[in-house]
Amino acid sequence: MGILSKVEDRPTPPSVYNWRVYACGAVAGSAAIMIGYDSAFIGTTLALPSFKDEFHFEKLGTKAVNLLNANIVSCYQAGAFFGALFAYIAAFFLGRSKGLAIFSAIFVVGAAMMLGANGDRGLGLIYGGRVLAGIGVGGCSNLAPIYISEISPPAIRGRLVCMFELGWQIGGLVGFWINVGLLPQS
């Protein structure tokens, strides 16, 4: 028995194990890339000198800066909590794939809001974008593994669900290393 061999409890036609199953699993698993990326980049972003300069953190005291940082991170977690709750409703009434599409769109809107934030506009866009991104991430982290496990044949179900975790870790790596590249060179 090899590492990629299939173990079946009942015979399944070979036509079931086609590229479509793997492609659907990979696409649904790619939802985890946004989860890993958004979770990873914020810590190093808050520490970047360019971020602190843009939002005038130097004018604030240490306690105020710590409070702002905690609020920026917490908004995302609060959104993820409610996104995970709303995911059940979306999955029940709309289905898993439509729910994934909706929560991914919510994430994109949140990311666009954060992209539009600058020192002149203040942190409001970042707070709102973090909440929406959290809702999208919470919904996708709930729906993607369920969707993948439902579409995959039993013999390769674990392999396909691992695509979700792989996407999460790839997103985390990208999120951390992009900010390392943005650090000022000394």
Can you name each region flagged by the protein language model?
Residues 1-186:
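Transmembrane-helix signature of 12-pass secondary carriers
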